[in-house]
Amino acid sequence: MAHVSLNNPKLTLEGAEAVLAAAKDQASRMGKPMNIAVVDDGGHLMAFARMDGAKPASIDIAINKAHAAAIRRQDTGPARIGNEVNVLISLGLAIGSRAHQTPIRGGLMLEVGGQCVGAIGVSAGTEDEDTEVARAGVAAFVKG
C-alpha cells in the first residue's frame, strides 16, 4: 500500500493573488513597473501581472524565474560550486532547459513547513530590485 500524506499544503488562488498584490504594492512604492508571476509547486502559472510601463521583454523572464524556483525547490541565482559562481554551469542550465532554468535572481520559493508550495518571479528591474519586490510577495505569504 502506498503511503500518502493527508496534510499536503497547496497554494490557493487567493494565496497567489495576495502574493501578487503585495509584490505589486512594493514595485509601486519603488516606482518600478514590473512583471510578476506566481506559480504552484509544479511551476504552473496561477497569477500574473504586467504593471503599466513594465518591459514586455521581461514577461517570460518573470514566469521562468518563478517556474525555476518552484521546480528546482530553491531561489533563482547563478550556479555555485562552493562559494564560487560557475558561469558555465549557469549558462548550461539556462540553455539546456530552453530558459526554464535561470541563473538570474528574482525567483523565490513560497514554503509551508519547509515544503515548497509555489514561487514568485519578478522581472523588469535590476536583479536587486526584482528580488526586493519578490521578497515583499513572500513576506505577505508568510504573514497570511
Which residues does each PLM region occupy?
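Flexible, solvent-exposed loop/hinge segments and secondary-structure transition points
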Residues: 1-144
